[in-house]
Amino acid sequence: MPKLIIVTGGVMSGVGKGVVVASIGRILRARGLSVNAVKIDPYINVDAGTMNPYAHGEVFVTYDGGETDLDLGHYERFLDVELSKRNNITSGQIYLTVIEKERRGEYLGQTVQLIPHVTDEIKRRIVEASGGYDVTLVEIGGTVGDYEQLPFLEAARQLGLELGEDVVFIHVAWVPLLKITGEFKTKPLQHSVAELRRYGIQPDAVVVRSEKPIDANSIKKIALFAHVPQWAIFNSYDVDTIYRVPLILEQQGLGDFLTRRLRLPSRSPEYRDWEEFLSKLSAPKYRISVGMCGKYVELPDAYLSIVEALKHAGAALDARPELVWINSVEVEKNPDILRKLDLDAIVVLPGFGKRGTEGMIECIRHARMEKIPFLGICFGMQLAVVEFARNVLGLKGANSTELDPETPHPVVHLAPEQREVDVLGGSMILGNREVEIVPGTLAASLYGVSVITERHRHRYEVNLSYLPKFTEAGLVVSGWRRDIKRVEIIELPGHPYFIATQFHPEFKSRPAKPRPVFLGLLKAALFAKR
């Protein structure tokens, strides 16, 4: 039988429930258990692929091409696993599947209803995802009381009834600190637990999210009104880095509680590598100023995995990347702002659409001309090709056909397999692809192997008809798609560090396993500083 830890949220969203879930996973992994994690998003979208990054943040791409919630990135980084697209369940997926089954006659003439048909489909997916694992974490997105959560809470209630002692319910809720009196206000949490109990779910444990460590009297009050023992109330307060949360919850006894409650093997947790990473992350010797140029920089969560990948690489080098967010629209208005920033490295970020792209191209030109270590990712690589075509080859008006369909020099164009696609969602080049590294290149020295596997999310590619001109002018293609001829990595010899990738290296970065292109960027920046 599967063992499930079902996590709900109360009071308000966006308080770090996903980090708490990932931390629980890390705690169990430290005991040698195999752990899976599922994120439920109650929105009607089938997946996150078409959602506005300002509203939703980053779209995290799984190895099998799922466009998922950014919490799956937290899960992968904390658990050091690769998750599937089946690990992100949405209302859209559930309703679509139920309707398709009804159209095929699979319900044999029944009146299809929320209960049992929708809830059965939810349960089926959760149980299916839990197969082969010691424990599966299930995070129900949103806040208890949201209308769209109801079928998922009902499915969770039914699973608790059907699986009994093999299900643990944990409720995560924010407790605000009233600064005028210095008092924690537990009433909103009490109400959220009361609301959860209305749906037939009594939490076995509560994780209190708070700005500062919560006091003993507040814990007593929560225990009384939430009907949870004091020893099953834990506190995830604000800390300098999210990677410290597993150790805080471990010290409070959450690991031992879950081991007892789910009758799991009792083993001493092993955190040696995690603690070593934390010590380097928290007290670095060096600082590196990294310019992050993109069009969604007002919401850094739109680039969350890149931010984390830079942290991982920095910790490996005993350095802290200090991120300078550069709005490419502002660069278009005033390119001179780049000179005033005194950057040690520049990353040009992924994106879509025309807005702000000339500012991104200017950032690339600045990095190339001023010999500043540079990394371009996905759209950033395509724009690096455009910049080189315009300013080195002298191809006036060179562009991507995504940005200018009438460009006289389409150095980046729609990939052949995308030209007949007329559906927006789930139709890009997605997921893992193998990339062959060209020997004797910067990419070869970074990766140290001839073939790598990286995750993708794009529609456009470098136009190979311009390749002879690029090669003659000194641009090197150092990585190719293995199954078809497609440019995956470009670089500029003679520059301290200038490399760009069509793939997204950030999605496979882990705290103890930073990705080579991020390591190389920060190494080059450190070398230049010295």
Curated annotation (Swiss-Prot):
GO-annotated molecular function: ATP binding; CTP synthase activity; glutaminase activity; identical protein binding; metal ion binding
Binding site for Mg(2+): 71, 139
Alphabetic keyword roster: ATP-binding, Glutamine amidotransferase, Ligase, Magnesium, Metal-binding, Nucleotide-binding, Pyrimidine biosynthesis
Ligand binding (L-glutamine): 54, 351, 379-382, 402, 459
Binding site for UTP: 13, 185-190, 221
SS bond list: none
Gene Ontology BP, a term: pyrimidine nucleobase biosynthetic process
Name recorded for this polypeptide: CTP synthase
